[in-house]
């Protein structure tokens, strides 16, 4: 009896889908494109699988121009030509652009179109810190999108403080902040060490947490706070989440996000930390989708 009821409900659901699909298919293709443009890139790719007319409508520049940043024309070089706005969109997702004189890189999150940013180690102002000015070696790295990365020679405390204007980010979006790094052959001094990290919009309440760079470190920190442990990325680097913040403003915003670390008084000698930079991306990363084969 239960099985029969389940089959009936399944048939009803499939019938509703066919009715909706049939109704929408009767609309002009341009109208369908306009409707889809108010969704998201992920939803558009799902819609393309509904029917042939939907697949054709999703290819329209009307759809993908809505998903592009409003200032996208200033982000691409005039000499580069794209066959469609969809091709341009996925180029901005897959090929990070260097901005701010090569101190930052920008790309779009594929599923949502939200902006992502990486601050290079240079933009972290490591060399401006009094105790850190001579403690980093700036070296070229073929694996990096930036000209140089920062390799820690020797220091008792790993501390930095940097700021970035939020206008380069997507408005009304919650972001997660990560420090991206590798371990050099002379890596030492980080085992069991937890470092306090602070992230927040200047003038507003900040997000405080504890991080560690050692994958074998303890799971708990002072005051019973959980320590964020590093994870291996697809590009071979490691990352540790520093914190989160909410970006309300957009291109005209004058807000700044401040990111810093503070180590306790019981510091120990450290070396061998290679820093690529600080990555800022939407806090709720949507799952990768692969149906976009248009």
UniProtKB/Swiss-Prot annotation:
Q: Where does the record place the F-box domain?
A: 21-67
GO process terms (BP):
protein ubiquitination
Q: Which domain of life is it from?
A: Eukaryota
The UniProt keywords, alphabetically, are: Ubl conjugation pathway
**Record has Cell division as a keyword:** no
Q: Name one Pfam family in it.
A: PP2
Keyword Lyase part of the UniProt annotation: no
So, what pathway does this thing act in?
Protein modification; protein ubiquitination
SUPFAM superfamilies cross-referenced by the UniProt entry: F-box domain (SSF81383)
**Subunit structure as annotated in this protein's UniProt entry:** Part of a SCF (SKP1-cullin-F-box) protein ligase complex. Interacts with SKP1A/ASK1.
Name of the featured protein: F-box protein SKIP3
Species the sequence originates in: Arabidopsis thaliana (Mouse-ear cress)
What is the gene name? SKIP3
């Amino acid at each position: 009896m239960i099985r029969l009821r389940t089959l009936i409900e399944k048939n009803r659901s499939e019938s509703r889908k066919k009715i909706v699909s049939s109704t929408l298919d009767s609309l002009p293709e341009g109208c369908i494109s306009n409707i889809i443009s108010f969704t998201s890139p992920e939803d558009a790719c799902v819609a393309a699988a509904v029917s042939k007319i939907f697949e054709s409508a999703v290819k329209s520049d009307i759809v993908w121009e809505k998903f592009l940043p409003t200032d996208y024309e200033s982000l691409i070089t005039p000499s580069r030509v794209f066959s469609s706005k969809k091709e341009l969109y996925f180029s901005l997702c897959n090929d990070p652009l260097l901005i701010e004189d090569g101190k930052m890189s920008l790309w779009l999150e594929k599923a949502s179109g939200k902006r992502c940013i990486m601050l290079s180690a240079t933009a972290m102002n490591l060399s401006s810190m009094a105790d850190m000015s001579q403690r980093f070696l700036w070296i070229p790295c073929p694996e990096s999108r930036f000209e140089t990365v920062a390799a820690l020679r020797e220091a008792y405390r790993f501390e930095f403080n940097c700021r970035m204007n939020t206008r380069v980010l997507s408005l009304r979006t919650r972001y997660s902040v990560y420090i991206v790094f590798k371990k050099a052959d002379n890596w030492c001094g980080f085992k069991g060490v937890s470092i306090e990290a602070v992230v927040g919009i200047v003038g507003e309440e900040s997000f405080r947490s504890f991080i560690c760079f050692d994958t074998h470190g303890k799971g708990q920190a002072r005051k019973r706070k959980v320590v964020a442990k590093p994870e291996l990325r697809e590009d071979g680097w490691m990352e540790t989440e520093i914190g989160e913040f909410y970006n309300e403003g957009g291109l005209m915003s004058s807000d700044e996000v401040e990111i810093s670390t503070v180590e306790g008084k019981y510091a120990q000698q450290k070396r061998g930390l290679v820093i690529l930079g600080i990555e800022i991306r939407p806090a709720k990363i949507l799952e990768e989708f692969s149906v976009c084969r248009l």
